[in-house]
Amino acid sequence: MTHLQTLWPSVALAVLAGLGAGAAWAQEPPALRVGALLWDRTEVTVAQFARFVQATGRVTQAEREGGGFEYVGGWQRRPGWTWRQPDGQPVRDDVPAVHLNFAEAQAYCQWRGARLPTAAEWQSAAYVEQRSDPPAPFQRARLYPYPTGETPQGANTSDPDPWPRAAPAGATAAGVNGLFDMGANVWEWVQDAQGEERRTMGGSWWYGAHQMRADVVAYKPASFYAVYIGFRCVRPVP
């Protein structure tokens, strides 16, 4: 039994027993089929979230309260830091949308007819290769220690890499199942709750590669928002 199977054996066994996934692309945004779900291939971007705001008129909590948070010897509010300008300055519209709390992430997904994944769904997509004929070096049915494969190489962590902050969608190395940034770049909200908190997955650019592993458990207040937290959506295969 592998290290990851000891952490979530029911997920690993179910996936390994019934691999039948292939790639399926949606018009907007790009999606990949992993098992019974279509996954956003990347984290939701500023441009994608902007379409939701334009359609719904949503004003986020960070915008109402004067800006999001960054950790510098403690949580510091940064005036003007919102999903529009994650670091308070104009950015490319293909960087992850951050400074969004759990409800805002879920609302965006629901607007698209999708939802946030569960932690178990997220782990199976991030660590178990389910493509029928994956490109090298990935191997079908292999359980990996990192979403990038055998090593964290190619992810956007605090270790040396080309990206000092969040990387644009698709800029890092594609990982297990062809998904981008399931490890690092920004934390991702999932549905799992612990009281008033919700779980986040995968680590971020602020942390080292150890936060990318499956055994990391990180909960945050559902109302919290910061420069390190984004999300992606899933929906059933039609």
Where are these regions (language model features)?
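Functional-site microenvironments in short loops/helix caps that host divalent-cation chemistry
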Residues: 59, 66, 70-71, 77-218, ...
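A generic structural micro-feature
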Residues: 223-225
